[in-house]
Design a protein with these regions (language model features):
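SDR active-site lid
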Residues: 181-260
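The beta1-alpha1 cofactor-binding region of Rossmann-like NAD(H)/NADP(H)-dependent oxidoreductases
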Residues: 40-41, 61-72, 104
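Canonical Rossmann dinucleotide-binding motif of NAD(H)/NADP(H)-dependent dehydrogenases/reductases
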Residues: 2-34
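Substrate-binding pocket helix/loop in short-chain dehydrogenase/reductase
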Residues: 98-99, 103-108
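Active-site helix of classical SDR
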Residues: 122, 164
Length: 303
């Protein structure tokens, strides 16, 4: 997609983090913007910001884990703007801790948002884009799915999150292959950020009442501490990611990385797989982090 002005972008998780920055960047490029978020107040604020800039904007409160709400989002976008050219399946949440300490509700919440949210978005908006292409022979579409470096790596205390992000990488690669197979006027990309301040570490604020969080275990408290520590130390911002992403869209680039240096860890993992070695120590280059994590778990267990 080389032209953005006048095109329509749909963004889930638009109220904060990457989603908010995607919306601001789309506005800067003179796109029409459809905002979706489960959190009503944050959705209101980004809508106000864009309207103050004179942007044509539609805001829809949406729980992406519900297919009927994604369908309603697509219907609202078409009713308002008549087409959708760019979709960011971006909404995401996080839950961390030892795998056996996660409840069924933890899994259902994170898988619902991170995985089913993207599945619904891909299925519904890809079909919608094909319909748009039937009407406009010059139509070009692009779908961007937010995964993570956790889509390539596995680390302690990250089972639920890593599982969903691995799924998104695979789903998006399959989408790419299917689109190429039929020579579709649609392209796609997958964003694989490392630690970037987005607010996802506080995503429990949007956890639905029917999937309550239990009392946190020592491992879950320690994981939360370590995630927040890593995010605070990041030198890459959500705005940086938005700029990288729009450049990638313009250049039909599939993989989008915030921290290319982390690809060395991916190579190490692939080497283990190819050599049939047991999974390696993700902290081998930074053993102090493992020590800190173990100590923090012990500290939380004693409180």
């Amino acid at each position: 997609m080389k032209t953005f002005e006048g095109r329509v972008a749909v963004i889930t998780g638009a109220g904060s983090g990457f989603g908010r920055e995607f919306a601001l960047k789309a506005a800067k490029l003179k796109m029409k913007v459809v905002l979706a978020d489960v959190q009503e107040n944050s959705l209101y604020f980004i809508r106000e910001d864009l309207e103050d800039q004179g942007v044509e904007v539609l805001a829809v409160q949406c729980d992406v884990s519900k297919k009927e709400q994604i369908q309603a989002l697509a219907d609202a976008a078409m009713a308002r703007f008549g087409a959708v050219h760019l979709v960011f399946n971006n909404a995401g949440v996080c839950s961390s801790g030892l795998i056996w300490e996660h409840s069924h509700e933890d899994w259902e919440w994170v898988v619902g948002v991170n995985m089913w949210g993207v599945i619904h978005g891909v299925r519904i908006f890809t079909n919608l884009m094909f319909e748009c292409a039937k009407i406009d022979p010059t139509f070009k579409g692009h779908i961007v799915n937010t995964a993570s470096m956790a889509g390539f790596l596995t680390t302690p205390l990250s089972s639920v999150y890593d599982t969903t992000k691995h799924a998104i990488v695979a789903l998006t690669e399959c989408l790419y292959q299917d689109l190429r197979l039929v020579d579709a006027p649609i392209n796609c990309s997958v964003i694989c950020p490392y630690f970037v301040p987005t607010g996802i570490s506080q995503s429990v604020r949007n956890r639905p009442a029917n999937l309550p969080q239990g009392e946190l275990t020592a491992s879950q408290k320690a994981a939360q501490f370590m995630i927040e520590r890593a995010i605070v130390s990041s030198k890459v911002s959500a705005r940086d990611i938005a700029n990288l992403t729009f450049d990638a869209i313009a250049n039909d680039q599939f993989y989008i990385y915030s921290h290319p240096g982390a690809l060395g860890l991916v190579k190490d993992r692939m080497d283990d797989i190819l050599k049939q070695q047991n999974p390696g120590d993700p902290y081998k280059t930074a053993p102090h982090i493992r020590t800190m994590l173990v100590n923090k778990m012990a500290e939380k267990a004693n409180k």
